[in-house]
Amino acid sequence: MEPSKVYYTDFRCPVGTSLLEKLRRVCIAAGIKDIDMDGRFVAIKMHFGELGNLAFLRPNYAKVVADLCKEQGGMPFLTDCNTLYPGSRKNALEHLSCAQLNGFWPMTTGCQVIIGDGLRGTDEVEVPVPNGEYCKTAKIGRAIMDADVFISLTHFKGHESTGFGGALKNIGMGCGSRAGKMEQHAAGKPAVQEGLCRGCHRCAKECGSDAITYNAENKAGIDYDKCKGCGRCIGACSFDAIYSPNDCANELLDRKMAEYAAAVCHDRPCFHVSLVQDISPNCDCHCENDAPILPDIGIFASFDPVALDQACVDACLNAAPLPNSQLGANLAKPGWNCYHDNFKDSNPNIEWKATLDQAEKVGMGTRQYVLKKV
């Protein structure tokens, strides 16, 4: 496979030129206007940030991308899917409120916000995974798969489970329904925290395997001989009583995530933009954000999300760590076993290369790229 083109600009702005204009230039240089969007629905997949977190991308960036789509006759909408865990984004009502409180609504972004997997995180489509090794199908939010064109707009950062959070994570994990997220994150089957169960029986009604029973105290329990591990009961519960107890090894998570991303992008026009700024050590899913581990680097865009992530990773690995950060503090510890890898030195119990390896393996793109400065 030939190296892919990745377009890049830094964050330096001469007088009279804003970062929003630089983002627009990078998108155009990378070929966003080559996509036929006329009369088509365009899903712009991004992360709206957990309440309390301030590292997520500003709504102004989303408006630049949405405006470019509308200029080409497209009908864009911002989207993300509900979270597997408790928080402010576990159902569509709370998720929309969170997005609005963080600044994402039509007056600021120029388009609507649609939660991709519906009210409870159960509105999903089972999509074939091309060349899937770990997942033969992926459970993806229906609204995302209904779109004619797919664009990822990613805040590139560190991550406590996957090493870094880039385009592949934004697409693969982010587009998964709650059941899809569980399939990626967990070894299999959910569990019940009895103290939170209200005995409403909603989970039993949602279960297609007749795997949920109730004890004498009217608390739910799961028959693991019948349970298929689909995760739909998690979405059905309004009280966070059903949860995923068993995280897989990080490498398996990384590889499943890459395959989910391949399912989302297969056989339709896709474009990818990543902003490498406010590089926090952990995910924007936290209700806080620690100090950036690296200085702001730039804006990257490409048709190839694998090459895009690799280019962003390389830029981060070549950047100087910031002293007042998780990374800087680790490196300053006496006797620290330095990995000479800014992601592993920030979160030493992770391995980030598997995501890129698996995405390349299933034919989503190539890790080889040519960087073109805009």
Where are these regions (language model features)?
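Terminal amphipathic helices with adjacent charged low-complexity linkers/tails
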Residues: A66-D67
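Extended, low-polarity segments enriched in aliphatic/aromatic residues
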Residues: E2-Y61, E71-D80, Y85-V374
